[in-house]
Design a protein with these regions (language model features):
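Substrate-binding pocket helix/loop in short-chain dehydrogenase/reductase
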Residues: 97-98, 105-110
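Conserved glycine-rich Rossmann-like NAD(P)H-binding loop of the short-chain dehydrogenase/reductase
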Residues: 30-47
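Conserved glycine-rich cofactor-binding loop
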Residues: 9, 16-17
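Active-site loop immediately N-terminal to the catalytic Tyr-X3-Lys motif
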Residues: 99, 148-152
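C-terminal helical subdomain
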Residues: 174-182, 202-239
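Residue(s) in the substrate-gating loop at a strand-loop-helix junction
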Residues: 141
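Active-site helix of classical SDR
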Residues: 121, 157
Length: 239
């Protein structure tokens, strides 16, 4: 049986845990050679040891501007070209009232959730266009439309990510490069650990959340559609 992504390459940010790790597993299981990006080197190496098709470990901190260039250079060296699939799953999840939010909170959240994806797209989109094919997946959130008290910073970054995805899609129309925004509801990953959602009345219990594999399934479905099919956006919620 031929795997749907056999011979393809993919780069996944935030791949050390949670949704990013689940996406990396799903793409590798479908035949892709996967590049793994995160600052958690040990976790990346542990994940890589479980994946087929010679995964590539590219540890870096995407909150720093030079990281996009370094990651791109490593991916180009390993793959020989821009990846066929770029999944922008790295993110941070600050919660708290606006009053009391620190400059560090703001800088980190926007750097990782909003700015880093654009830096990576800037590095890889020209190669995808020259090849006439590529697929960029932005990991969004229902917070790009739904805002509640204490998630002002996170929601603002995800509104920015939505705008970026829509702009990249519009700028790439007719080039063979597709862009998909995948926006899940609350998903049970370690990103929730500091917030103890089961103890907070305004937050969903963890057993009511999506699983990382649910989101990975959606990403895999989007990137395995025929080349003439654009999946602009997928919004996922728990039934």
């Amino acid at each position: 049986m031929t795997l749907p992504l056999a011979g393809r390459t993919a780069l996944v940010t935030g791949a050390s845990r949670g949704i990013g790790a689940a996406v990396a597993r799903a793409l590798a299981a479908a035949g892709a050679r996967v590049g793994l990006v995160s600052r958690a080197t040990d976790q990346l190496q542990a994940l890589a040891a479980t994946l087929p098709h010679e995964p590539v470990v590219l540890p870096d901190d995407l909150t720093h501007a030079p990281a996009a260039v370094t990651v791109a250079a490593g991916a180009l060296e390993a793959f020989g070209n821009a990846p066929d699939i770029l999944v922008l799953a790295a993110g941070t999840f600050p919660l708290g009232p606006v009053v009391g939010t620190t400059d560090a909170d703001l800088d980190t959240a926007f750097a990782l959730n909003a700015v880093a994806p654009l830096r990576l797209v800037r590095e890889f989109l020209p190669g995808m266009r020259s090849r006439g094919a590529g697929h960029i997946v932005f990991l969004g959130s229902v917070a790009d439309r739904y805002v509640f008290p204490t998630n002002a910073v996170y929601a603002a970054t995800k509104h920015a990510a939505r705008a970026a995805a829509e702009a990249v899609r519009a700028e790439s129309r007719g080039t063979g490069v597709r862009t998909t925004l995948v926006s899940p509801a609350a998903t049970d990953t370690p990103i929730w650990d500091p917030h103890e959602p089961d103890a907070q009345a305004h937050l969903p219990n963890r057993d009511q959340m999506l699983r990382p594999e649910d989101v990975a399934d959606a990403v895999l479905w989007a990137v395995t559609r025929p080349a003439h099919v654009d999946v602009d956006e997928l919004r996922l919620s728990r039934s």
